């Protein structure tokens, strides 16, 4: 990826997320509800719920919205029963895609995903066709200029799997999904605030898209992320400005 700045890509991605703040609340409500349903309503014993609640607080979601979502998940309040579904497929030039949905209508979800992929030059694949190209892990990114030694010491002591310093000076901390929240809290307690922190599907290899192909791929990703049932989209594609 010669000439490609990972830091620039992260900033671009954060900008896109901020522009879709309205949908972020909807996604987080769904995630909190499903997390509570699957693992219980106590954040101390449910790492997935703990991470979702922490993200909701960072996005300034009102506390009563968070509490209601947890209660819907535990059954204390009536709510929609969302099902988790993962679709795999391909985008422009065969770029791998993983599309995670939370939906109350599986038929609608798959029809919408298939339609967007077909419309934008991609196609839906079979289960497992691209998942092997990604690693399920926690990722925390620190901006260039952050002390590598401080991050390394705090992260590894808290149980992180790896600390990677990129050519542009940004630092990535990789964790097991179950250790993500503990590592994030340990780093923040040490005064180290990540600019991006998420449990994600991290591609083993990335392909840089630029020019017309980059524009097409970005349109495809945006269209998928705009679907109501879609929670997350992971790809091997990196869009270069």
From Swiss-Prot:
Top-level taxon of origin: Bacteria
Cellular localisation: Cytoplasm
InterPro entries assigned to the protein according to its UniProt record, in alphabetical order: Integrase-like_N, TACO1_YebC-like_2nd/3rd_dom, TACO1_YebC_N, Transcrip_reg_TACO1-like, Transcrip_reg_TACO1-like_dom3, YebC-like
Main subcellular location: cytoplasm
Any single biological process term in GO: regulation of DNA-templated transcription
Keywords annotated in UniProt: Cytoplasm, DNA-binding, Transcription, Transcription regulation
Record-linked Pfam families: TACO1_YebC_N, Transcrip_reg
Listed GO CC annotations: cytosol
Similarity section: Belongs to the TACO1 family.
Protein name (Swiss-Prot/TrEMBL): Probable transcriptional regulatory protein Mfla_2355
Organism: Methylobacillus flagellatus (strain ATCC 51484 / DSM 6875 / VKM B-1610 / KT)
